[in-house]
Amino acid sequence: MPSNVPAAPITTAEVLPADELERILEAARTASTSLAASTSVQRDAALDAIAAALVSGADRIVAANAEDLAAGRDAGLAAGLLDRLTLDARRVASLADAVTGIRGLDDPLGLVVRGRTLPNGLLLSQVRVPFGVVGAIYEARPNVTVDIAALALKSGNAVVLRGGSAALRTNAVLVDVMRGALERVGLLAHAVQTVDAHGRAGAARLMRARGLVDVLVPRGSAELIRTVVAESTVPVIETGAGVVHVYLDASADARMSVDIAVDAKVSRPSVCNAMETLLVHRDAAPRVLVAVLDALRDRGVTVHGDAAVRAMWPDAVPATDEDWAAEYLSLDLAVRVVDSVEDAVAHIARWSTHHTESIVTSDLAVAERFLAAVDSAVVMVNASTRFTDGSEFGFGAEVGISTQKLHARGPMGVQELTSTKWIVRGSGQVRG
């Protein structure tokens, strides 16, 4: 049976000396100081160079990726993970385009968040500054290697990456390409680092590198995220798994219901913003359920339904509590009939990972109740959940979709990779 867990790290990578890992982390800290003092022109030049290097190095990147894909298939990786792992020429070009998009974003550094003049004449301003060193732990997602590095550089941060064994060869080439681009424009190559060659030891040290790494972002399976949150001494921004819901309300338009459900489930089922559970109001079910499920079945979706769903659409297989909690990352879908918007909200509150939920409705009052009651990072009305994405939100790319409430929530772009500090300008004032 295909596995949803990336293959174990390549064992030869475990023999690298621990002091080399420390040098990597310390070099990243040094590079972060240099980046914080760099200009937006310098950082944008670096991003231009990276985009160009990705294009010119596409053949090398795709060749390395082919080796990772072959190893992944031999290891029995699931289709969803293999899809995320894949970098063909088109996807490499898209990565370069994403870097160019990030380069075109406004510089977040030095932005004044708020300010005032005190009665004693002191001038206060709160301004955006880099975190310093951003760590990332992720699996089978080579696009994340480029996205996070580019966002970190744009926001003046160094980055230390742990991309997992499944993409080991691809990530090594991507990091080498980006480091070469940095050197060509006069920035420190150490601003982009990887600890992949250290295997699990690298991940463990990265999680405990408080003082050298300022913030850690995990992206991947629920198990990976739980492990990082539980074991890290570095502050973590949690990017949760995507048990994503679409709710078809009593007044849902039938055509819109089909279009949104199909897009949310089928367009790319292996990503975190894909719909995993469909909730249907009992009054809407006779109008919309069969049409929606027929359209999904015709596109290869297996429906896991409750008794009410199976009574109206016998092709469904029985759903259990495991289905309501499942992030399938495949062409599987859990479907339940509910009695009201309140029942839908209650189901979401119990089973959601607080990523993205959407309601399809023609009733503005019901839409507002749903928006107010659902506690997720992104809540939508009459739109596919697939729009929860940094590029779709205009961020160029994303570090991840934060499902926590502290610091950042939702798609994380360049501003979410900054902190703030207070600048106080005086003319000799003393408190006395």
Swiss-Prot record:
* UniProt catalytic activity: L-glutamate 5-semialdehyde + phosphate + NADP(+) = L-glutamyl 5-phosphate + NADPH + H(+)
Q: What class of enzyme is it?
A: oxidoreductase
Keyword terms: Amino-acid biosynthesis, Cytoplasm, NADP, Oxidoreductase, Proline biosynthesis
Q: Does the keyword Amino-acid biosynthesis apply?
A: yes
- The lineage's top-level taxon is Bacteria
- Compartments where located: Cytoplasm
Give the pathway annotation: Amino-acid biosynthesis; L-proline biosynthesis; L-glutamate 5-semialdehyde from L-glutamate: step 2/2
Molecular function via GO: glutamate-5-semialdehyde dehydrogenase activity; NADP binding
Q: Name one cellular component (GO) term.
A: cytoplasm
Give the GO biological process terms.
L-proline biosynthetic process
Q: Which SUPFAM superfamilies match?
A: ALDH-like
Q: Does this entry carry the keyword Lipid metabolism?
A: no
Its Enzyme Commission number(s) read 1.2.1.41
Q: Which family does it belong to?
A: Belongs to the gamma-glutamyl phosphate reductase family.
Query: Function, please?
Result: Catalyzes the NADPH-dependent reduction of L-glutamate 5-phosphate into L-glutamate 5-semialdehyde and phosphate. The product spontaneously undergoes cyclization to form 1-pyrroline-5-carboxylate.
List, alphabetically, the NCBIfam families matched. PRK00197.1, proA
- Name the chain's protein: Gamma-glutamyl phosphate reductase
Q: Which organism is it from?
A: Clavibacter michiganensis subsp. michiganensis (strain NCPPB 382)
